[in-house]
Regions:
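Hydrophobic/aromatic ligand-binding patch that stacks against planar heteroaromatic rings
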Residues: 133-137
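Glycine-rich, Lys/Arg-enriched anion-binding loops that position phosphate/diphosphate groups
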Residues: 138-182
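Short acidic, Gly/Ser-rich segments with clustered Asp/Glu that frequently serve as metal-coordination loops
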Residues: 28-36
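Glycine/threonine-rich flexible loop motifs
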Residues: 119-128
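Short, Asp-centered acidic motifs that coordinate Mg2+ and/or phosphate
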Residues: 110
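A cross-family phosphate/adenosyl-ligand binding-site feature
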Residues: 16-18, 22, 36-101, 106
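Short glycine-rich anion-binding loops that position phosphate/pyrophosphate groups of nucleotides
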Residues: 28, 57, 90-91, 116-119
Length: 182
């Protein structure tokens, strides 16, 4: 992806470097296979990935945020172009804390929710923490998408999604999304 971006001489907002920064979260927790599959799909492309996800499952939290719970961030790992943090809050808390605390108020080039284990189509998207992540990014005018798998089984093979995920991410980073659309 990164070499493609360089060849295209893109004119999108960059976060301190010429390498795009993507903020990733989910509602299944930072150890869930879906978010790790997403990182594995995108890390080889050369983009920088900041993962800030709940410290455990938070499915069904939609756009909820914590108003009374003291929130904590815990660094998990940092390797090459991937940095992983855990948060004791909701998926939306993760996005807010990543931008405000980890990035010091700087906006990432893109926000991604997922890969969710389970369908988020139709009415389900109103309850989904994965969709809440994309909505939070959208409200901050950051190009945002969410990926979900119809497979609820955490052992599901998500590798067939890789070409689609990479193509969608490249398209969004290349041309953005209309303001307020996720």
């Amino acid at each position: 992806l990164f070499s493609y971006f360089c060849r295209k001489n893109l004119k999108y907002m960059m976060s301190n470097t010429d390498i795009p920064l993507i903020l990733i979260s989910n509602d299944d927790g930072y150890m869930a296979p879906g978010i790790n599959a997403l990182v594995d799909m995108l890390a080889p492309t050369g983009v920088r990935l900041l993962v800030c996800a709940p410290d455990g499952p938070r499915s069904g939290y939609s756009c909820a945020f914590s108003s009374e719970l003291p929130l904590r961030l815990k660094p998990i790992s940092r390797k090459d172009n991937v940095e992983i943090w855990a948060c004791n809050g909701t998926p939306v808390d993760c996005v807010k804390l990543a931008i405000d605390r980890i990035l010091g108020g700087k906006m990432p080039d893109m926000v991604i929710g997922g890969i969710n284990h389970g369908d988020n189509s139709t009415v389900n998207n109103h309850y989904s923490g994965t969709m809440g992540i994309a909505k939070e990014g959208c409200m901050k005018y950051i190009p945002s998408v969410a990926f979900s798998s119809c497979y609820y089984n955490h052992d599901a093979d998500l590798s067939p999604l890789a070409p689609y995920v990479r193509a969608i991410v490249a398209k969004v980073l290349d041309g953005g999304l209309p303001r307020g659309v996720c």
